Swiss-Prot record:
It is found in: Plastid, Chloroplast thylakoid membrane. It comes from Arabidopsis thaliana (Mouse-ear cress). May function in mediating the binding of the antenna complexes to the PSI reaction center and core antenna. Plays an important role in docking plastocyanin to the PSI complex. Does not bind pigments. This is Photosystem I reaction center subunit N, chloroplastic. GO terms for biological process: photosynthesis. It holds the Pfam family PsaN. The modification N-acetylglycine is found at G87. GO terms for cellular component: chloroplast thylakoid membrane; photosystem I. Keywords: Acetylation, Chloroplast, Membrane, Photosynthesis, Photosystem I, Plastid, Thylakoid, Transit peptide.
Length: 171
């Protein structure tokens, strides 16, 4: 008994003590006033869950009406946002069509410029003293066939210093 925890002893004293008759009746313990030499018998309390009758039906109706309200709100929000997005989608389609035309022109100019780059020295459009830093740089300074047009188309519609050809060169 000396090795028991003090809180366990306190609880045992409160339940088994002389002033705990009311507590024993509330908890459901059997009053055990027995003499010396006999064993005490305690019955542990039983906790029973009880169901409330009548309120359950109203609670499920409240939940059901809340779910209907939530579904209606979501549906109306989706309908409004779909009609609002229609203008944005039309704007994106128009911009995509414009970009496609510009990109087709760029693709055609780049293929011609790639052909010209292969033969710039042979055609004489990019000679030695002028092409010291490369024909790309020469095309920015003076007109080189196909390459200058390719650079101009590549930078069309963009900020002058944000163009891919102008990373290290400022006009």
């Amino acid at each position: 008994m000396a090795a028991m925890n003090s809180s366990v002893l306190t609880c045992s004293y409160a339940i088994a003590g002389s002033g705990s008759v009311e507590l024993n009746q509330k908890v459901g313990l059997v009053n055990s006033s027995v003499g010396f030499g006999q064993k005490k018998q305690m019955i542990m309390p039983v906790i029973k869950a009880q169901r409330v009758v009548g309120d359950d039906v109203d609670g499920s109706n409240g939940r059901r009406s809340a779910m209907v309200f939530l579904a209606a709100t979501l549906f109306s929000t989706a309908a409004v946002s779909a009609s609002a997005n229609a203008g944005v989608i039309d704007e994106y389609l128009e911009r995509s069509k414009t970009n496609k035309e510009l990109n087709d022109k760029k693709r055609l100019a780049t293929s011609g410029a790639n052909f010209a780059r292969a033969f710039t020295v042979q055609f004489g459009s990019c000679k030695f003293p002028e092409n010291f830093t490369g024909c790309q740089d020469l095309a920015k300074q003076k007109k080189v066939p196909f390459i200058s047009e390719d650079i101009a188309l590549e930078c069309e519609g963009k900020d002058k210093y944000k163009c891919g050809s102008n990373v290290f060169w400022k006009w």
